[in-house]
C-alpha cells in the first residue's frame, strides 16, 4: 500500500522546482526546498526550506539526515552527487544517483548516447587546454559550438565561425564552467530544421509514456520560447521516441525526462537530456490535461497516469528582466491577460539581473502561429520598473 503524505526534498528551488512543489502540495506531500540563496521560488511554496551550498558534500549530507525525507528530487545539476550515491541506500533518489551524475556533465551523457548506445549525435570532441582546442576545432570544422562540460542554461556557450574566435570562446567556457572543471566540449554545428524536446515519463509499472513533441527556440543555448505540438512526420516522431526510450531505459528510475533532439529532414539527432521537468515544457502549464510537473510527481509517487491529452495548439515565451535590482517590480499584467486563453506565471525570484528569466507567458489558439503571437504579446506586456 502506498501511504501518504510523502516527505519530499527538492535539491534546487528555482522556477521548475516551484512548480514541482505546487504539484507535490496538491497531492498532500510535505515539501522541503533547498537552494544556495534565500527566498528561492520553491521556498515560497514549501513547508520547510534550507539555504546551503549543495556542492558541499558534508553540508548536503547533514541537511538530508536532519530532514530525513522519503524522496529526494534533484532539480539542478550543481550537486555533490557522490553523497546522493551513498544516501540512495536508505532514501529514494529521483530518478537515481547514476542518472543524476551522468546528466550533470555533457561529456558523460554524450559518451553514453554516442559511444555506448551508438545513437546519432553531432560530431564532438573534448579539450582541456587551448592547444587541444585548436587541434580538435580543425578536425570538426567550422562553424562549431564550444560549451563547458559542466554548466546550465547555455552559460559559457559560443558559436565559433573561425579559428580567430577560439581563444575568446575558450575563456568564456572556462569562466562560466560550474565547479573547477577546465574541460570543454567542441560540437559540430547542426543546421537543423527544428529543435524539439520529447518529455518522456518512466513509470514504476515499467511503462514509458510520451508527451506530444515540443518545438523550441534558444538564444545562446538558453530557452526563449516553445510550442506544442511540434509538427513532425510519423517516422521522425517514432525515431525520437525509440531513442528517448533507449537512453532513459539505460538511465533507469522513474519520473519525467526532458530529451532534446535536432531534427533535420528525416534525421533525428540526439542533443541533451535532463532527468527532470524541462524549461521548454513550461508550455504544458496550458497545453495538457496534466502538466509536466504533475506527470513527474505521479511517476515519482507511483500514481497512475490514465492518459496525456494535448488540448490544442499552445505556446510559451519567457519574460526576461530588463534591469538589475533586489526590489523586483513590474507592470503590464492587465494588458498581458486581456487575451483569451492566455496566462502569465511569475516565478517570484527575489532579485533580477538584466536578461534573467523572471516568468513565462503561455497561450492557446487554433494554430501554433496564433498561439506564439499571443504568448509573445503577453510576455512583452510585462515591464520591469524601478519603484
UniProtKB/Swiss-Prot annotation:
It catalyses: N(1)-(5-phospho-beta-D-ribosyl)glycinamide + formate + ATP = N(2)-formyl-N(1)-(5-phospho-beta-D-ribosyl)glycinamide + ADP + phosphate + H(+). The keyword Nucleotide-binding applies. One of its GO terms (cellular component) is cytosol. Keywords: ATP-binding, Ligase, Magnesium, Metal-binding, Nucleotide-binding, Purine biosynthesis. Residues 111-301 form the ATP-grasp domain. It comes from the Bacteria. One of its GO terms (molecular function) is phosphoribosylglycinamide formyltransferase activity. Mg(2+) binds at residues 260, 272. Its EC number is 6.3.1.21. InterPro entries: ATP-grasp (IPR011761), ATP-grasp_carboxylate-amine (IPR003135), ATP_grasp_subdomain_1 (IPR013815), PreATP-grasp_dom_sf (IPR016185), PurT (IPR005862), PurT/PurK_preATP-grasp (IPR054350), PurT_C (IPR048740), Rudment_hybrid_motif (IPR011054). GO terms for biological process: 'de novo' IMP biosynthetic process. N(1)-(5-phospho-beta-D-ribosyl)glycinamide binds at residues 15-16, 75, 279, 349, 356-357. ATP binds at residues 106, 147, 152-157, 187-190, 195. Belongs to the PurK/PurT family. PANTHER family: FORMATE-DEPENDENT PHOSPHORIBOSYLGLYCINAMIDE FORMYLTRANSFERASE. Homodimer. This is Formate-dependent phosphoribosylglycinamide formyltransferase. The lineage of its organism: Bacteria, Bacillati, Cyanobacteriota, Cyanophyceae, Synechococcales.
Amino acid at each position: 500500500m502506498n501511504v501518504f503524505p510523502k516527505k519530499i526534498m527538492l535539491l534546487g528551488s528555482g522556477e521548475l522546482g516551484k512548480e514541482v512543489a505546487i504539484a507535490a502540495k496538491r497531492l498532500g506531500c510535505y515539501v522541503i526546498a533547498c537552494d544556495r540563496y534565500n527566498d528561492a521560488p520553491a521556498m515560497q511554496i514549501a513547508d520547510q526550506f534550507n539555504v546551503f551550498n549543495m556542492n558541499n558534500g558534508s553540508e548536503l549530507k547533514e541537511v538530508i539526515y536532519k530532514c530525513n525525507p522519503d524522496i529526494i528530487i534533484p532539480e539542478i545539476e550543481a550537486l555533490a552527487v557522490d553523497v546522493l550515491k551513498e544516501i540512495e541506500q536508505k532514501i529514494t533518489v529521483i530518478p537515481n544517483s547514476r542518472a543524476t551524475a551522468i546528466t550533470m556533465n555533457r561529456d558523460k551523457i554524450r559518451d553514453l548516447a554516442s559511444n555506448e548506445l551508438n545513437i546519432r549525435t553531432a560530431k564532438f570532441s573534448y579539450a582541456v587546454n587551448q592547444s587541444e582546442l585548436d587541434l580538435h576545432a580543425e578536425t570538426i570544422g567550422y562553424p562549431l559550438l564550444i560549451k563547458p562540460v559542466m554548466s546550465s542554461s547555455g552559460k559559457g556557450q559560443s558559436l565559433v565561425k573561425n579559428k580567430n574566435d577560439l581563444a575568446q570562446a575558450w575563456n568564456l567556457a572556462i569562466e562560466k564552467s560550474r565547479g573547477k572543471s577546465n574541460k570543454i566540449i567542441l560540437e559540430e554545428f547542426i543546421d537543423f530544421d527544428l529543435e524539439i524536446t520529447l518529455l518522456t515519463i518512466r513509470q514504476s509499472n515499467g511503462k514509458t509514456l510520451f508527451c506530444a513533441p515540443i518545438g523550441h527556440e534558444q538564444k545562446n543555448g538558453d530557452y526563449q520560447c516553445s510550442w506544442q505540438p511540434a509538427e513532425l512526420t510519423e517516422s521522425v516522431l517514432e525515431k525520437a521516441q525509440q531513442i528517448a526510450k533507449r537512453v532513459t531505459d539505460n538511465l533507469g528510475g522513474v519520473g519525467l525526462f526532458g530529451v532534446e533532439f535536432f531534427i533535420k529532414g528525416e534525421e533525428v539527432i540526439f542533443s541533451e537530456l535532463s532527468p527532470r521537468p524541462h524549461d521548454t515544457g513550461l508550455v504544458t502549464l496550458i497545453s495538457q490535461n496534466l502538466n509536466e510537473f504533475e506527470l513527474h510527481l505521479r511517476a515519482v509517487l507511483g500514481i497512475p497516469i490514465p492518459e496525456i491529452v494535448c488540448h490544442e495548439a499552445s505556446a510559451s515565451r519567457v519574460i526576461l528582466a530588463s534591469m538589475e535590482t533586489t526590489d523586483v517590480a513590474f507592470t503590464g499584467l492587465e494588458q498581458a491577460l486581456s487575451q483569451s486563453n492566455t496566462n502569465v506565471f511569475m516565478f517570484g525570484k527575489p532579485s533580477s539581473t538584466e536578461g534573467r528569466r523572471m516568468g513565462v507567458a503561455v497561450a492557446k489558439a487554433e494554430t501554433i502561429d496564433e498561439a506564439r503571437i499571443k504568448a509573445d504579446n503577453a510576455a512583452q506586456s510585462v515591464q520591469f520598473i524601478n519603484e
